[in-house]
């Protein structure tokens, strides 16, 4: 049962026949094996073709983690026969040779397909479930079609799950084959949902930031420079007895792929395509994924739009990569959606190269991007085609390359966006002119970065353990905007990027450390927080309150917040505080009308009159 290091996938005893051509002598080993019972018969037909029938048992002590099914062996043998029949040598053979070869082929084909079918492990289908994690996507579950009704508890140790991964383009980084650890097993429906009875068994698989064997992605380092899907094949086999609900034995080799379900990602429209004819760069094609909140369809109100711009590794033409490479799917979960009345639309735009492409195919050195106009036209087209979107509440952000593009878009179109959230942004300080700073200082902006970012480096740690900025990127942009008078500019600066779930740890028990460039995890997990007006506010809670319509009101609120009580009488200060509280409530109301906003602003201005009265 050992075929080149592979274990033949059999169940119990099975007879296999081998055809031996006329004139080939059998050695004494055949007689020896026949005497031992491994060979059950040796027969020769009228044409001199000998058939040797073997009895194969899997109790022969063959140790191998790699399994090949009998069906695969048959297919391979048939393919070899077909190759011989179609070869030039065969075509050039004389009639007599061709006739004998034809006869031999017929005999071989017959013996290849003549086996005891009832004893063969039945092949069945499986489906996979993919989820987005902090480190990227992973296949977390395999759903096996057992073909029989199952019930009760399922022993997870009864299953062996093997996987092979093949890069469709370029070299594969990481393992090409391996075994997945099964952490749980249960009866389910076809979608992997637990069930009391059902014809399916779902296997939960171990996942983690270092278990790349479970990833459907490969980073094409030597090619596109993007994350790309790999060809993934699973095989699930049994290593223990399994009983169906009726008590009958269950056996299978699940090796026929049926479908993949990618949680949350499948809730997006993944077919977005947009074309733009740029005056300088010619025809530009963009792809995109978009999400429509279910509640927004019939709530009778306009809803916000969140725009995400991917990093360099998520470019290309497959929007799934842009959603899963950086856990952007979280924008469609309650983690973010809970703050938006009726939910928020999500637009994840994707460029074929990288946002920092200045038209040469290389990284920009002057802060320009060939995609600037094309992206703006895509955004406008998407907003215009969805009448339910509130054009005064369009928020733009992204990470790394996408952080660069976020800055690029707001300095080119400062009046279009209600707020921005650049993460580990790569827009250099040299490219950010004073005029640009002046144009966006009144826009609400929340920066995020990690001190130990090795890609977009923002500083160093001195000998005393203090962070020293290098005067570039997020820290410098934040500094310049606040010094210019920006009153709603925020910055979450983290020491590092580490696991916050408690699930993944280092050998010493401390949280698993991700690459310091990955500060987008804090943004997408809503873990950026700041104390604003005495209240701890998260980044998405903050973004959800921003609107171009109430930006004037927010500026007045900021000025009133800076007033001092000692400059007012007790009564006048109480009036100011009352008007301030009312104004804040209006500013936070996502459905506030222009009339309500103007009234709140007038009341606040009136109560903070030039002559505040006599202090006391």
Q: Residue ranges of each PLM-predicted region?
A:
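Beta-rich interaction/scaffold domains
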Residues: 550-616
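C-terminal catalytic histidine-bearing segment of alpha/beta-hydrolase fold enzymes
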Residues: 446-448, 452-455, 464-550
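Primarily recognizes the serine-hydrolase "nucleophile elbow" in alpha/beta-hydrolase
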Residues: 383-439
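Active-site machinery of serine-nucleophile hydrolases
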Residues: 305, 312-373
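Preference for extracellular/luminal or secreted protein segments
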Residues: 2-116, 594-609, 614
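The conserved beta1-alpha1 loop
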Residues: 309-311, 449
């Amino acid at each position: 049962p050992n075929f080149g290091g592979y274990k033949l996938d059999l169940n119990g005893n099975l007879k296999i026949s081998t055809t031996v051509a006329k004139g080939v002598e059998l050695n004494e080993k055949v007689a020896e094996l026949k005497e031992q019972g491994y060979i059950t018969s040796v027969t020769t037909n009228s044409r001199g073709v000998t058939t040797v029938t073997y009895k194969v048992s899997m109790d022969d002590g063959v140790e191998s983690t790699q399994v090949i099914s009998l069906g695969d062996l048959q297919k391979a043998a048939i393919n070899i026969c077909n190759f011989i029949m179609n070869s030039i040598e065969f075509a050039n053979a004389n009639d007599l040779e061709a006739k004998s070869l034809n006869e031999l082929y017929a005999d071989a084909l017959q013996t290849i397909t003549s086996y005891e079918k009832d004893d063969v492990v039945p092949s069945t289908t499986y489906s996979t479930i993919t989820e987005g994690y902090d480190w990227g996507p992973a296949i977390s579950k395999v759903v096996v079609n057992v073909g029989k009704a199952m019930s009760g508890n399922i022993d997870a140790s009864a299953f062996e799950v093997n996987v092979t991964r093949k890069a469709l383009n370029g070299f594969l980084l990481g393992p090409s084959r391996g075994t997945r650890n099964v952490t749980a097993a249960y009866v389910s429906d076809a979608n992997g949902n637990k069930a009391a009875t059902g014809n399916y068994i779902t296997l939960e698989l171990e996942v983690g930031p270092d278990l790349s064997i479970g990833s459907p992605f490969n980073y094409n380092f030597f090619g596109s420079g993007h994350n790309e899907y790999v060809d993934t094949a699973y095989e699930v086999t049994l290593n223990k007895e399994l009983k169906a609900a009726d008590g009958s034995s269950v056996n299978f080799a699940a090796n026929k792929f049926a479908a993949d379900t990618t949680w949350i990602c499948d809730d997006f429209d993944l077919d977005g395509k947009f074309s733009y004819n740029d005056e300088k760069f010619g025809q530009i094609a963009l792809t995109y994924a978009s999400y429509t909140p279910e509640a927004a369809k019939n709530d009778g109100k306009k809803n916000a739009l969140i725009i995400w711009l991917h990093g360099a590794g998520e470019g290309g033409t497959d929007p799934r990569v842009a959603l899963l490479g950086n856990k952007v799917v979280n924008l469609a979960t309650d983690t973010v959606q809970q703050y938006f009345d009726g939910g928020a639309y999500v637009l994840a735009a994707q460029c074929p190269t990288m946002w920092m492409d200045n038209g040469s195919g290389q990284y920009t050195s002057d802060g320009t991007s060939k995609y600037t106009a094309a992206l703006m036209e895509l955004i406008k087209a998407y907003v215009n085609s969805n009448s339910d979107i509130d054009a005064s509440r369009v928020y733009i952000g992204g990470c790394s390359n996408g952080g660069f593009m976020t800055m690029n878009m707001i300095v080119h179109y400062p009046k279009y966006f209600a707020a921005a959230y650049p993460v580990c942004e790569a827009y250099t300080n040299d490219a950010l002119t004073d005029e640009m700073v002046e144009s966006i200082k009144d826009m609400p902006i929340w920066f995020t970065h990690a001190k130990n970012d090795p890609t977009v480096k923002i500083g160093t740690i001195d000998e005393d353990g203090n962070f020293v900025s290098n005067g570039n990127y997020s820290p410098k942009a934040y500094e310049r905007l606040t010094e210019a008078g920006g009153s709603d500019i925020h910055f979450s600066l983290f020491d590092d990027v580490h696991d916050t779930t408690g699930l993944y740890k280092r050998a010493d028990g401390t949280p698993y450390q991700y690459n310091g460039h990955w500060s987008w995890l804090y943004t997408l997990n809503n873990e950026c927080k700041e104390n604003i007006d005495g209240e701890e506010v998260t980044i998405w809670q903050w973004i959800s309150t921003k609107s171009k319509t109430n930006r004037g009101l927010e500026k007045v609120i900021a000025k009133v917040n800076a007033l001092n009580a000692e400059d007012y009488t007790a009564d006048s200060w109480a009036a100011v505080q009352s008007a301030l509280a009312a104004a804040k409530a209006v500013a936070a109301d996502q459905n506030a009308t222009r009339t309500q906003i103007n009234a709140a602003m007038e009341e606040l201005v009136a109560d903070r009159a030039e002559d505040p009265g006599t202090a006391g």
